[in-house]
Regions:
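A structural-propensity feature for long, helix-poor, extended segments
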Residues: 47-95, 241-247, 252-255, 831, ...
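Acidic, glycine-rich flexible loop/linker segments
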Residues: 58-62, 302-305, 316-317, 325-341, ...
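Conserved phosphate/anionic-ligand binding catalytic regions in large, soluble enzymes, centered on
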Residues: 22-54, 116-147, 186-230, 317-339, ...
Length: 937
């Protein structure tokens, strides 16, 4: 089939339609758009997708492409085999005569002595969601007579192993993806490099980053030199930073005439014979290596071109540029796909705003689907409204990357609240605290307190009144319960107030008369006035416990091990009860050998029905689920199943206990912790008993320790009851999804998670669901793959503060020590707690931990987590079990591998990698993919 039957095989950049991705591919379309807008793009044309269709029009090739689409992304060997078959088929193909003539005719528009850049341009590359950088071929310095062959090679590179695997992982159809090819004369560049119109290291959309080197950009793209690196503020044109790199070589076009003199270097390698054009590598003189490539004025000019490209193409751009004859030209432009999305909606006041990740605060930083985000945004808004703070916050929450962020700008703009927030949040998540401190220190003008204006006075009066009305009724109960705790009359596990608290949360949803009303009630579930009046007094002794814990830590700063010990060994603690319950289940299985054998062989609960002793085990298991079946991993994400729905993780823990422990070991462990706590308390009392007032101090410390232990053990009880509410909300919303399935509005009940709140309400009121659920599922999957920052600004900057741990071993990872002690062992990296177990003696390495991870702590000897703080769940459990722990370790699950030996110091907050660590990406400097000798793009 001739290309002309479907469209021209060639489109020049200036021609209408060349900016169409379906015609010119991503790279070609972007260059055409820039050229048509008047930006400096070297003259060139695109061999279009019509030519690609001409090349692949063969039943054998189409069959192989369809076979690729039918394969699973995990079948890498089969994918590679079919891809190799396709490349072989394409290498034996030729363009039709009409297509070949069209391309060769276009080439006559250039000088015969020109050499060319031949760049692949797939229809699925250089898109906002998928860049395909480094997946397809690019050839530089190509002689005119070889262009046609290189075009065929570029089209065949659509099926390189890496390109096929990338499309398969990202759910992109191979049959729907086509290849165009960009043809341009090579630019004889004095300098070249890469411009990022947003800083890729921080995400700041108002800072551009430039890498620059002498000669062609190939040396930078290939990673062969350390380029100059500059940062420019695009609002003020200020050059914020210019670092001169060590540029040992330059790559230049091969010219017979005085090329060495122009570069003032020595030729060290010739990539192609002189008569074929091509490039060569030049070794630069010592002075040249250390000299600046670009002046400040040149930087500003280049950044201005980048801003125009970003505005035209609608997203921050990764631009390859060259400087020739004193003028900049743009060689390529594609979206920066690695940036974390900018928070939305933007601030209404036009000023800098700072947002804190709700997920990081809850030790659950993963993305959540749209409806779940709406639940928590509504919840936060209602809480602020009840406190009278809604007017002060504007949009109290924003979204970015499938996460909810809380606007803390109002706190940071107040001199007293600023320090209070930064100090208090340090115990929850140290990176958030240091991030807030860093942005306040770096941008003080944004957080200057401007006083209370006359116009704002009514708002302050209203806020004060609401706070008094909200907290006032709770004050007597708070005082009464704290005094009761101090007198030894603290809450007990049998106190019905705990279940009443859960009943309050659950009943506000389940008591509604209809499924529609119950779904709406989820978004109104917390009556904050009633919460403060009835619930806050019950949990107030917990604040006393935290205060006493802080006092003990400060007073006995030289005895951290003993202070940690008195905070564990509680049989009544929720976490301990969960683990004791799982251990008891293993003992039940041991008492029935056939059950134990079946479980070791991977039996499910249903499989045990006909096994001798199986019913006894099932009854015990159901008793456990009656108490804890509403728990699960990532509990604040209502879309995730609970243990009652999917008990496979619990059964895996029981299997591990059967394999690695004897009967009663789990209860012996708790008894040892109780004994350790009593011994530690005695030692702390002895430390206090010195001098004339020693006996009095001893009694005082004994009283404080008793009060601390009588109150701190119930720290997980509020979460236990809150999780009951979350499960009720989940059930109600899934029921609403089922209702919409019955009406033909949704395909599956869990599609409901991909609706927005207003869309759900409209559908329940009889409206039509006009939503692309599949697209939202794909967007959610992309969000899940992103690493979210704990602090982000309205400018898109991911703010990271520095934690000073003093001298640390080279290569050590630094985080926050939350449970003292040192342990050395093999790492077990787990990202999904439902699909893995920890073997005895291993150190658990996780992205985050919440109550759903609790069973995995049974066999662990230490914890490393990417997220968390001193009072996060993982820290509490680690201290309860006496495990050294370091949290808030950036990229821990990427930089540590399973089986690697590590040394964990929970006192200093460091993790030493004792085996050779895996290579990692340097966050401070982003490098482009390394290329083959002919270039890969």
């Amino acid at each position: 089939m001739s290309a002309n039957s479907n469209g021209s095989a060639v489109r020049w950049f200036h021609e209408r339609g060349a900016e169409n991705i379906g015609v010119a591919g991503g790279k070609g379309a972007n260059l055409a758009a820039l050229a048509r807008a008047g930006l400096p793009v070297p003259r060139g044309f695109v061999v279009t997708t019509a030519a690609y269709r001409d090349l692949v029009e063969s039943p054998q090739i189409r069959d192989a492409i369809n076979r690729l689409d039918a394969l699973d992304a995990a079948d890498t060997d089969v994918l590679a085999a079919v891809a190799a078959e396709l490349r072989s088929l394409l290498e034996s193909r030729e363009f039709s005569a009409s297509v070949e003539t069209t391309i060769t005719d276009a080439m006559t528009s250039f000088e015969s002595t020109d050499s060319f850049a031949v760049r692949s341009s797939a229809t699925a590359e250089d898109l906002p969601s998928a860049s395909f950088a480094g997946q397809h071929e690019t050839f530089l310095g190509v002689a005119s007579d070889d262009v046609l062959d290189r075009v065929c090679d570029c089209m065949a590179s659509l099926f390189t192993d890496r390109a096929v695997a990338y499309r398969a992982r990202n759910g992109i159809s191979h049959a729907d993806t086509e290849m165009a090819v960009v043809i341009q004369p090579m630019v004889d560049a004095a300098a070249a490099g890469v411009l990022f119109t947003a800083d890729p290291a921080t995400g700041n959309r108002h800072v551009s980053a430039v890498d620059a080197g002498f000669g062609l950009g190939e040396s930078i793209v290939a990673g062969d030199v350390t380029p100059d690196h500059a940062l420019v503020n695009t609002r003020t044109d200020e050059v914020l930073e210019y670092t001169v790199g060590t540029k040992t070589i330059a790559v230049e076009l091969h010219r017979d005439s005085a090329a060495g003199e122009r570069t003032r270097g020595r030729e060290i390698e010739e990539s192609q014979p002189a008569e074929a054009g091509g490039t060569r590598r030049i070794e630069l003189s010592a002075n040249r290596r250390e000299s600046r490539v670009l002046t400040d004025d040149q930087l500003r000019t280049l950044v201005g071109l980048g801003e125009r490209a970003e505005t035209l193409l609608g997203a921050p751009q990764d631009v390859e540029w060259a400087l020739t004859d004193g003028q900049f030209v743009l060689l390529q432009s594609r979206p920066i796909t690695s940036l974390f999305p900018r928070p939305s909606p933007p601030p209404v006041d036009g000023r800098l705003h700072v947002y804190v990740s709700m997920g990081h605060m809850q030790a659950m930083p993963e993305a959540m689907p749209p409806l779940v985000r709406d639940v928590w945004r509504t919840y936060t808004g209602n809480a602020l409204s009840s406190a009278g703070l809604d007017a002060s916050f504007g949009n109290p929450t924003v979204e970015a990357g499938g996460r909810v962020f809380i606007d803390v700008t109002s706190f940071l703009r107040h001199p007293k609240l600023q320090s209070w927030l930064i100090d208090r949040i340090a115990a929850i998540n140290e990176p958030i605290s240091t991030g807030l401190a860093a942005i306040v220190s770096r941008r003080p003008e944004e957080f200057a307190f401007r006083g209370v204006t006359v116009g704002a006075l009514p708002g302050y009066v209203e806020t004060t009144g609401r706070l008094v009305r909200l907290i006032g009724p709770a004050a007597p109960g708070i005082v009464r319960n704290i005094l009761g705790a101090l007198a030894g009359r603290g809450p007990t596990p049998d106190d019905e107030s705990w279940t009443r608290m859960g009943d309050l949360f659950v009943g506000q949803v389940t008591d509604a008369p209809t499924p529609e009303a119950r779904a709406r009630a989820v978004f109104e579930a917390i009556d904050f006035r009633r919460f403060f009046r009835d619930v806050y007094p019950r949990i107030s002794p917990l604040f006393l416990a935290f205060a006493l814990g802080g006092w003990l830590t400060r007073t006995f700063s030289e005895q951290p091990t003993d202070v940690n010990a008195i905070g564990r060994g509680f049989e009544r603690d929720v976490v301990t009860r969960i683990n004791l319950g799982l251990g008891d289940l293993a003992d039940v299985a041991r008492a029935h050998p056939q059950v134990a054998s079946a479980l070791r062989d991977g039996a499910s609960l249903a499989d045990l029905e006909d096994v001798d002793g199986g019913e006894t085990f099932r009854e015990a298991f159901n008793d456990f689920l009656d108490e804890f079946g509403h728990r699960g991993t990532g509990e604040i994400d209502l879309s995730r199943p609970r243990w009652r729905e999917d008990p496979s993780m619990l059964l895996a823990v029981v299997r591990a206990n059967l394999a690695n422990e004897a009967a009663g070991d789990h209860r012996d462990r708790i008894r040892r912790l109780v004994d350790d706590a009593e011994a530690a308390a005695a030692r702390l009392e002895a430390y206090a008993d010195h001098g004339l007032l020693g006996p009095l101090r001893r009694r005082y410390v004994r009283w404080l320790i008793r009060t601390y232990r009588d109150t701190v053990y119930f720290r997980e009880y509020p979460k236990q009851e809150a999780a009951r509410a979350f499960t009720a909300w989940r059930t109600v919303l899934l029921d609403a999804g089922g209702l919409l399935v019955d009406e033909g509005q949704l395909d599956r009940p869990d599609d409901v998670w991909y609706l927005r709140k207003d869309e759900l309400f409209d559908a329940l009121d009889g409206g039509c669901v006009d939503v692309d659920i599949a697209a939202r599922r794909q967007e959610h999957a992309r969000n899940v793959d992103m690493d979210a920052p704990p602090v982000v600004t309205s400018e898109g900057e991911a703010v990271r503060g520095q934690v000073d741990r003093g001298p640390v071993p080279e290569g050590a990872l630094v985080g926050t020590g939350v449970s003292s002690g040192v342990v050395e062992g093999a790492a077990r990296v787990i990202r999904d707690p439902t699909a893995a177990t920890v073997e005895p003696g291993e150190i658990l390495v996780a992205p985050s931990t919440d109550p759903g991870w609790t069973p995995l702590f049974l066999n662990a000897t230490g914890l490393v987590s990417e997220v968390g703080g001193a009072v996060s769940h993982g820290a509490l459990v680690a201290r309860e079990y006496g495990l050294p722990a370091v949290v808030s370790v950036p990229e821990a699950t990427k930089r540590i591998r399973t089986g690697q030996r590590i040394r964990l110091d929970g006192t200093r907050g460091t993790v030493d990698l004792l085996d050779e660590p895996l290579a990692t990406t340097d966050e401070a400097h982003v490098k482009r993919p390394k290329t083959d000798s002919h270039g890969v793009d």
